[in-house]
Amino acid sequence: MSVTKSYEEIIDFIAAGSTPEGVVAFHPSEALQQRVAELVDQSKQGSISAEDQAELEDYLQLEHIMIMAKARARQNLGN
């Protein structure tokens, strides 16, 4: 799985016409969660390749964007 999959999941979610409720409820797929867990484990063990490190960093940026989007969606919902 490449970082492209991370981007594809978020792009598909946005393109489907997300609502504030949908943004709050969004979670990455199980496959993506497993891939990220693998990358984190590799990073902790010091055995991560440069390509995998870049993939992990890209995912972390996307995760930050989604955290911020969820916070904004909660504000829009009045929570």
Each predicted region: which residue ranges?
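Extended, charge-rich alpha-helical interface modules
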Residues: M1-N79
